[in-house]
C-alpha cells in the first residue's frame, strides 16, 4: 500500500538547513493555511543575556552606594556661643595657670644669668701719680658664661613654643591649664585651635599688654570671660 502525503496545513514544513560559517538561522516561514504556530523570536547577539534596563527618568543613573568599609566624617564639635558666664574659666584661675606656665622659663633663664655672673672675669688697672695711687677694675662675662646663658635662653624659648603652641594647640591645655583643669577652644567649634593659631593667639596677647595690661583684665567683666586676644582669635577658656 502506498503512503499518502499529509493534507495541507496539518504540519509545519521542515526547517531549512543551517547557514554556512556558523551564521544564525533565519526564522522559519509562516505555516501554510494559518495553522496558528508563531515563529520563534530571533536570538540576541552577543552573550545571549537580556539588555540592561533603561536609566530612570532624566537619563542619569543613580549614584553608587557607599563602600562597605567607609566611615562618615565626624560632625564638628558643638558650638559654645550660648553658655552662661559661670561656665567659663574664672580670671583668677587663668592667672594662676599663667604663673605655672611661665615658671620653667623663668627658672631656665635665671640659671643662665646666675652662671654668667658667677663666671665673669675682672681686669684691673693701677694708676700712679705724684699725689695719688688709684686702681680701676672692670668686670665682664666670660665666654663660657655667655654660652651657657644663651643656650638656656634658647631652651626656655623652645619650651614656650612647645607648651603654648604644640601642647595647647593640640589638646587645648598648656601645663598650667592642665594642672588647673581647663582648656582653650574655639568658640565656634568647641575644639582646640591647632599649633599655628595657638602661637598666633599668644602673640595677640601683645595687644592686651600695650594698653597698660588692661586687656588681661577683660575676663573680670566680660560675659564670656575673654581677653582681647581671645576676642580676636574667637577662643574661650572652659573647664575640662
Swiss-Prot record:
Q: What subcellular locations does the record give? A: Cell membrane
Is Membrane given among the entry's keywords?
Answer: yes
Q: Enumerate the UniProt keywords alphabetically.
A: Cell membrane, Membrane, Repeat, Transmembrane, Transmembrane helix
Q: List where the protein spans the membrane.
A: 98-118, 142-162, 203-223
State the Pfam families in the record: RDD (PF06271)
Asked whether the keyword Membrane is assigned, the reply is: yes
Bilayer topology reads: Multi-pass membrane protein
Q: List the disulfide bonds.
A: none
Q: Where is this region: Disordered?
A: 1-78
Give every RDD domain span: 89-233
Can you quote a single GO CC term?
Answer: plasma membrane
**Something else known:** Was identified as a high-confidence drug target.
Protein name listed in UniProt: Proline-rich antigen homolog
Source taxonomy: Bacteria, Bacillati, Actinomycetota, Actinomycetes, Mycobacteriales
Amino acid at each position: 500500500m502506498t503512503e499518502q502525503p499529509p493534507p495541507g496545513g496539518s504540519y509545519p514544513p521542515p526547517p531549512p538547513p543551517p547557514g554556512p560559517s556558523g551564521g544564525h538561522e533565519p526564522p522559519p516561514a509562516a505555516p501554510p493555511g494559518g495553522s496558528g504556530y508563531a515563529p520563534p523570536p530571533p536570538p540576541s547577539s552577543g552573550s545571549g543575556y537580556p539588555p540592561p534596563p533603561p536609566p530612570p527618568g532624566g537619563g542619569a543613573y543613580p549614584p553608587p552606594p557607599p563602600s562597605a568599609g567607609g566611615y562618615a566624617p565626624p560632625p564638628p564639635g558643638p558650638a559654645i556661643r550660648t553658655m552662661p558666664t559661670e561656665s567659663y574659666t574664672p580670671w583668677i584661675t587663668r592667672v594662676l595657670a599663667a604663673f605655672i606656665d611661665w615658671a620653667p622659663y623663668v627658672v631656665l633663664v635665671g640659671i643662665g644669668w646666675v652662671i654668667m655672673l658667677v663666671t665673669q672675669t675682672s681686669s684691673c688697672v693701677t694708676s700712679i701719680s705724684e699725689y695719688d695711687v688709684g686702681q680701676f677694675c672692670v668686670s665682664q662675662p666670660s665666654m663660657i658664661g655667655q654660652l651657657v646663658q644663651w643656650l638656656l635662653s634658647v631652651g626656655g624659648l623652645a619650651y614656650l613654643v612647645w607648651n603654648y603652641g604644640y601642647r595647647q594647640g593640640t589638646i587645648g591645655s598648656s601645663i598650667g591649664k592642665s594642672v588647673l583643669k581647663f582648656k582653650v577652644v574655639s568658640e565656634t567649634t568647641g575644639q582646640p585651635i591647632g599649633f599655628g593659631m595657638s602661637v598666633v593667639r599668644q602673640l595677640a596677647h601683645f595687644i592686651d599688654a600695650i594698653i597698660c595690661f588692661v586687656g588681661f583684665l577683660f575676663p573680670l567683666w566680660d560675659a564670656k570671660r575673654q581677653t582681647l586676644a581671645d576676642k580676636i582669635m574667637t577662643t574661650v577658656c572652659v573647664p575640662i
